[in-house]
UniProtKB/Swiss-Prot annotation:
GO cellular component: extracellular space
Source organism superkingdom: Eukaryota
Organism whose genome encodes this protein: Paralichthys olivaceus (Bastard halibut)
Family: Belongs to the NPY family.
Pfam families in the cross-refs: Hormone_3 (PF00159)
Protein name per Swiss-Prot or TrEMBL: Pro-neuropeptide Y
GO MF entry, a single one: neuropeptide Y receptor binding
Keyword Secreted in record: yes
Amino acid sequence: MHPNLVSWLGTLGLLLWALLCLSALTEGYPVKPENPGDDAPAEELAKYYSALRHYINLITRQRYGKRSSPEILDTLVSELLLKESTDTLPQSRYDPSLW
């Protein structure tokens, strides 16, 4: 093969790979509900507004990742690193007879 043809095939492959990645990203995005129109019955409008509210909640929610992993990590850190043994804690000097 000619070097020019190989570079074109590489560029074409990279472009197809980028399009494939972009299409995978757009599939995960929720689809906006369609407006039924101004003369739609009240039931259709109620369904539309409910779907629209759900759509807005989906696209504007905060994403923190898995909810269980920070709790596990916090527990692990607090138990292993921050836990003090009982002999390192200062002893109380409180004497109830002095009061």
